[in-house]
């Protein structure tokens, strides 16, 4: 037996919190009967509908590494009709992203069919390392020679773990940035604060998972063995 909200989340429909809202809002049925309590227990024999759509309540959590190209947004529906990551994914079941990459960023984006798994990866207590390669225009010394930790920008605190100069040419510099808790546009805001303009941002690692030789637009599934190892290491 398992709680209804968890089953819906594990099916990749939404997060567990949003699943609870759907249940309370009367959008969920078990064997044709509307259920209003998120704490309701169900098993594999029950037929579950969410907003009129049957879900698979027996699937195992799965995880994919996807190389998100520039120009796609990480959402299922966009009010501005921009191209989304999920419109480009062919051959995958319904998935959700673990975290986000903004429109002009690229690189490693984790996808899963399990809302519970996504929650485990995203919560700050997991302390999963995110590594980025960043190209920026401007004087790198202004950033590197000042204290970039515990910055308060527009009322929001940012605390990158490390920023390291990789190489420098006449107009641009490449940096490695390591975060343990990513906030919206955190890297771009920090660089802008020190007068640098980010013109390329690539996430290359999330936890122990790396982008490797994956090309933009391609994805690969993580084996159960590697997924289990990742979960043991981090949680």
Curated annotation (Swiss-Prot):
Keywords: Isomerase, RNA-binding. SUPFAM superfamilies: Alpha-L RNA-binding motif, Pseudouridine synthase. PROSITE patterns: PSI_RSU, S4. It is an enzyme of class 5 (isomerase). It catalyses: a uridine in RNA = a pseudouridine in RNA. GO terms for biological process: enzyme-directed rRNA pseudouridine synthesis. Its EC number is 5.4.99.-. The active site is at 102 (nucleophile). InterPro entries: PsdUridine_s_RsuA/RluB/E/F_cat, PsdUridine_synth_cat_dom_sf, PsdUridine_synth_RsuA/RluA, PsdUridine_synth_RsuA/RluB/E/F, PsdUridine_synth_RsuA/RluB_CS, RsuA_PseudoU_synthase, S4_RNA-bd, S4_RNA-bd_sf. The keyword Cytoplasm does not apply. One of its GO terms (molecular function) is RNA binding. Belongs to the pseudouridine synthase RsuA family. Residues 2-69 form the S4 RNA-binding domain. CDD domains: PseudoU_synth_RluB, S4. Pfam families: PseudoU_synth_2, S4. The keyword Isomerase applies. This is Uncharacterized RNA pseudouridine synthase RP544. PANTHER family: PSEUDOURIDINE SYNTHASE FAMILY PROTEIN-RELATED (PTHR47683), RIBOSOMAL LARGE SUBUNIT PSEUDOURIDINE SYNTHASE B (PTHR47683:SF3).
């Amino acid at each position: 037996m398992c709680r209804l909200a968890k089953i819906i989340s594990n099916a990749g429909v939404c997060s567990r919190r949003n699943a609870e809202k759907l249940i309370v809002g009367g959008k969920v049925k078990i064997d044709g009967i509307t259920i209003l309590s998120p704490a309701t227990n169900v098993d594999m024999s029950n037929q579950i509908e969410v907003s009129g759509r049957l879900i698979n309540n027996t699937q195992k959590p799965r995880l994919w590494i996807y190389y998100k190209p520039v120009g796609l947004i990480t959402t299922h529906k966009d009010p501005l009709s921009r191209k989304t990551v999920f419109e480009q994914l062919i051959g995958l079941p319904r998935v959700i992203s673990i975290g986000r990459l903004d429109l002009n960023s690229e690189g490693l984006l984790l996808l899963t069919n399990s809302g519970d798994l996504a929650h485990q990866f995203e919560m700050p207590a997991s302390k999963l390392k995110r590594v980025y390669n960043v190209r920026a225009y401007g004087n790198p010394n202004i950033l590197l020679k000042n204290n970039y930790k515990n910055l308060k920008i527009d009322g929001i605190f940012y605390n990158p773990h490390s920023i390291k100069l990789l190489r420098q040419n006449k107009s641009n510099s490449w940096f490695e940035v390591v975060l343990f808790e990513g906030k919206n546009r955190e890297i771009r805001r920090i660089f802008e604060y020190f007068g640098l303009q980010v013109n390329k941002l690539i996430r290359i690692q999330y936890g122990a998972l790396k982008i490797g030789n994956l090309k933009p637009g391609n994805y690969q599934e993580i084996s159960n063995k590697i997924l289990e190892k990742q979960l043991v290491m981090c949680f």
